Amino acid sequence: NMPLGNNTIVSINSGTDKTSFNLSGNYYSEQGVFVKDGYSKGGYNLRIKHDVFDNFTVRFSNIVSKGNRESNGGLAYWRNPIFPIYDNNGDYYMIGQNDYTHPVAITNLRQNETKTIDVISSASLEWQIIPSLRLTSRLNYKYGSSVNDQYFPSKYTEAGDFNNGAGYINNWEGQNFVSETFANYNKTFGKHDLGVTGGYTYESYVSRSSGLGAFDFVNETLGNENMGAGNPERNTVSNGKVQTKLVSGIFRLNYGFADKYLATVTARADGSSKFGKNNQWAYFPSGALSWKAHNEEFIKKINVFDELKFRASYGISGNQGINPYQTLSRYGVSQYYDNGRWVSAIGPGYVVGTTGQDGIEKLWGGIPNPDLKWETTAQSDFGVDISILKNRLHIVFDYYNKQTKDLLRERILTPSSGYDRIWVN
């Protein structure tokens, strides 16, 4: 096919001296070079700003989109172009009895479609309480869902041939909510500049997924729109749920004197649901000092440096980059096909790999570690910034020293333990 695309946008703008309004709609579509290989998406974007008072402003935005993707292309790469599409009888030309590489047959008969919905909403307020004190609060919400439909007919596809038709429906839904509130105080007293920030953030994430598989269809007319036509003894059902929370408190102090001497002190506390009750919270301080030597009178007299700045900093940061529930025992149910029947395996873990059509490699990863805690990294930095020749030449020197403690990693266990691996610090 000739690749074609379309992108249409319609926008409306309006407002008063206190309110501004914007609404736009968008439709986008593209057709790939392959048959039944395309993508389309439609949605709208709404933005509103309103000054309730001269010192109090609220904002709201909402973005919604709905997409659809068909993915059936790419098979022509593996097919010799000298083979015809149809034989003399008008049927699809087959190289042999087990020909699973006919791109046109597979594209026309196999189904692989994904439908998505995405929502991004945000609301915020800014309150200038006094000239030196401002309060900001934000709420952000993100929602996404997808439904993937696949059907492999009993002819022309390997998965369908071995299973007398194979259908799959996979659903996913995720929600992310973030709340932030910060207060900022900035004041100048003669040569003294003071800035203080305090804030609180809360983040919650939850996702749910489910999957249905059906095989050995009595009638393939409706494909996976009639999953009940599959052999009930071979049907597979799966589902899962993941939920995490992160809470943070932040404090920062900035001080400057005569635009020469600068200091910053930051302290934050983070609590993550990924760790056990005794190790959910960790504290991360940091500090920095700098000296703008080019603002000193004795440096100005040299008339060489446009900038000469010495700086030093030290800070501790944290990492919680592990999957949730690693501190808990996890039990799962898996099925594998053996000698013409499905066998259920129940154990403290989950399936992470396959070994072909006749079995599933079961790597149990469910052993708990309630003592897991934050990975921390301490870093110090000493540097010099130099600019000369009317800022035409910039020179930067930096010395870093970074040390990580309590590194989060997977430890491989001996097979005799009955487990595959465990997360440790």
Where are these regions (language model features)?
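Acidic, glycine-rich flexible loop segments
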Residues: 1, 5-9, 76-104
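Residues embedded in well-ordered regular secondary structure
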Residues: 1-36, 72-75, 105-113, 125-128
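Extracellular/periplasmic, surface-exposed regions of secreted and cell-surface proteins
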Residues: 41, 47-56, 60-66, 98-152, ...
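N-terminal, polar/charged subdomain of small-to-medium soluble alpha/beta proteins
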Residues: 158-159
